Swiss-Prot record:
The chain crosses the membrane at residues 7-27, 57-77, 95-115. Integral component of ER-resident dislocation complexes. One of its GO terms (cellular component) is endoplasmic reticulum membrane. It comes from Xenopus tropicalis (Western clawed frog). Residues 1-6, 78-94 are lumenal. It is found in: Endoplasmic reticulum membrane. Belongs to the TMEM129 family. Residues 28-56, 116-362 are cytoplasmic. A zinc finger (RING-type) spans 285-350. Keywords: Endoplasmic reticulum, Membrane, Metal-binding, Transferase, Transmembrane, Transmembrane helix, Ubl conjugation pathway, Unfolded protein response, Zinc, Zinc-finger. InterPro entries: TM129. The keyword NADP does not apply. This is E3 ubiquitin-protein ligase TM129.
């Protein structure tokens, strides 16, 4: 049986990681800095900038107390170590105690410095000052952002720890400890990366995330990256004034069918290959007439007389892309989690098949 100190350590590590990175379960339970300190932070809708100035400061202070919380907990989980008496503790614990004291002291001094000049020393205030007119201040920029954030036509997406917000004038990225801000009229946007995941934890369907670099012509504004679901790409472009360059030649799937098609292709490419006899020639795909047909349906999923699938005797008449589009078009659009395991009729002879039966012709 594990000792209480090991159990407490594992539990506290899990709690700390979840408290810092705040998964959906912690948000639902209200175990976040924003919820615990909501009375002091105020309302994001009323004063967006001042809310995040306080939130980032409070988050830094709260997170700096986590090591101290662990030490206090260990005093109760392992009383035989007598950790409450620092002079009797081992050297390693003495160093840890020093760290637990220095962290909140340092962050408190930093928070006090940020709060001077009515929060004028805060990193967000300094960032906004780069966008202020010569005869103006960061507070004028903050007022503009606050006003535009209250409008219902803004674009907002992402997890609470990495939100992307686009208003008529501003592009903002809100993270745990900072807020990046760029003015729309000054920016260049470039798609730099794309990551596709076979399953989304929320919908149990394939999902593609794209990364866009936001670079300002203002040399004092640091570039930053925003990350969003490809299905939101079209809505983002409508809100942006500047075009988005695709420097990495990334294929962006803006619909669920686009993402399914990529998954369909990758699965078919892993299936068995159909060897075409030497006296047969491939004809153009009857679906698009732009490429040769390269798909043959052969029942490989089960024995000949078993299961729902049937043997198709059609010659190769469809290309992989058109067959994938046909497969997607026959699915229940309300239940995408069933697409990969479903059966559909052959577009020519109506014999039922599944993805395992789709073979590339060689």
């Amino acid at each position: 049986m594990e000792s209480p100190e090991v159990t407490f350590t594992l539990a506290y590590v899990v709690f700390s990681v979840c408290f810092v990175f705040t998964p959906n379960e912690f948000h639902s339970a209200g175990i976040t800095v924003q919820n615990l300190l909501s009375g002091w932070l105020g309302s994001e809708d009323v004063a967006f900038v001042h809310y995040h100035i306080r939130r980032s400061t409070a988050t830094l202070l709260t997170h700096s107390l986590l090591p101290m919380g662990y030490f206090i907990g260990m005093c109760f989980a392992a009383p035989e170590k007598e950790l409450y008496n620092v002079y009797k503790a081992a050297d390693g614990w003495k160093v840890f105690v020093l760290i637990t004291v220095l962290l909140p002291v340092t962050t408190s001094i930093l928070a006090f410095y940020w709060s001077q000049k009515r929060w004028g020393n805060h990193p967000l205030a300094k960032t906004l000052a780069h966008h202020a007119l010569p005869q103006s201040s960061w507070r004028a920029v903050a007022s503009s952002i606050n006003t535009e954030f209250r409008r219902i036509d803004k674009f907002a997406t992402g997890a609470p720890s990495a939100r992307v917000i686009v208003t008529d004038t501003w592009v903002m990225k809100v993270t745990t400890y900072r807020v990046d801000v760029a003015q729309q009229q000054d920016i260049h946007l470039t798609v730099t990366d794309s990551r596709q995941h076979e399953l989304s934890p929320d919908s149990n369907t394939p999902v593609q995330f794209i990364t866009i670099r936001v670079a300002s012509v203002n040399p004092r504004v640091k570039p930053f990256d925003i990350r969003l679901n490809s299905t939101e790409y079209g809505e983002l472009r409508e809100k942006l004034h500047a075009p988005i360059r695709n420097a990495a030649n990334v294929v962006i799937h803006q619909t669920l069918s686009d993402m399914f098609l990529e998954t369909f292709k990758s699965l078919v490419e892993a299936n068995q290959v159909y060897e075409l006899s030497s006296n047969q020639e491939l004809e153009p795909c009857i679906g698009c007439m732009q490429t040769n047909a390269n798909i043959k349906l052969v029942k490989y999923c089960q024995e000949a007389n078993e299961g729902e699938c049937q043997q198709c005797y059609c010659r190769p008449m469809w290309c992989l892309t058109c067959m994938g589009k046909w497969f997607a078009s026959r699915q229940d659009q309300q239940h995408p989690e069933t697409w990969l395991s479903s059966h559909v009729p052959c577009p020519t002879c109506r014999a039922k098949f599944c993805i395992v039966d789709v073979c590339i012709v060689r």
